[in-house]
Amino acid sequence: MMKSIQLCILLWCLRAVCCHSCELTNITISVEKEECRFCISINTTWCEGYCYTRDLVYKDPARPNTQKVCTFKELVYETIRLPGCARHSDSLYTYPVATECHCGKCDSDSTDCTVRGLGPSYCSFGEMKE
């Protein structure tokens, strides 16, 4: 009886690891432009999931400890025209779309690597247009 419970727990853990690996997922983000003074929601794809990582107890200064995160491997950019902007303003908005994901080091030059970023639904204007 105890062995079958342990086996079930082991299989459940293996399922959690393999089924929630780093992969593409659909998300909704808020986009805004200063000239338009409002936000709209758009759908795109981004990377989500778990990556195997470890934090060493004894730190070795000669070997940097890099945590792996689920991040994009390939990106394309799409452009939309924001509706309802002022007549002479630039209403084009370009946003990233992930096309391939992997577990790797977070690139702070192109990604918000903070623990608590603003989040994809943040709108600085406080007004969302449908």
UniProtKB/Swiss-Prot annotation:
Which residues are glycosylated according to the annotation? N26, N43
UniProt keyword list: Disulfide bond, Glycoprotein, Hormone, Secreted, Signal
Q: Which GO terms describe its molecular function?
A: follicle-stimulating hormone activity
- Provide the GO biological process annotations: follicle-stimulating hormone signaling pathway; G protein-coupled receptor signaling pathway; ovarian follicle development; positive regulation of bone resorption; positive regulation of gene expression; positive regulation of steroid biosynthetic process; regulation of osteoclast differentiation; regulation of signaling receptor activity
One GO location term (cellular component): cytoplasm
Question: Which SMART domains does the record cross-reference, listed alphabetically?
Answer: GHB
Provide the protein's localization.
Secreted
A Pfam family recorded for this sequence: Cys_knot
**Keyword check for Kinase:** no
Q: Span of the secretion signal?
A: 1-20
Q: Please give the positions of the paired cysteines in each disulfide bond.
A: C22-C70, C36-C85, C39-C123, C47-C101, C51-C103, C106-C113
Q: Which SUPFAM superfamilies match?
A: Cystine-knot cytokines
InterPro entries reported in the protein's UniProt record: Cystine-knot_cytokine, Glyco_hormone_CN, Gonadotropin_bsu, Gonadotropin_bsu_CS
Question: What the protein does?
Answer: Together with the alpha chain CGA constitutes follitropin, the follicle-stimulating hormone, and provides its biological specificity to the hormone heterodimer. Binds FSHR, a G protein-coupled receptor, on target cells to activate downstream signaling pathways. Follitropin is involved in follicle development and spermatogenesis in reproductive organs.
Q: Which family does it belong to?
A: Belongs to the glycoprotein hormones subunit beta family.
Q: What does the record note on quaternary structure?
A: Heterodimer. The active follitropin is a heterodimer composed of an alpha chain/CGA shared with other hormones and a unique beta chain/FSHB shown here.
Instruction: From the Swiss-Prot or TrEMBL record, give the protein name.
Output: Follitropin subunit beta
Gene transcribed to yield this protein: Fshb
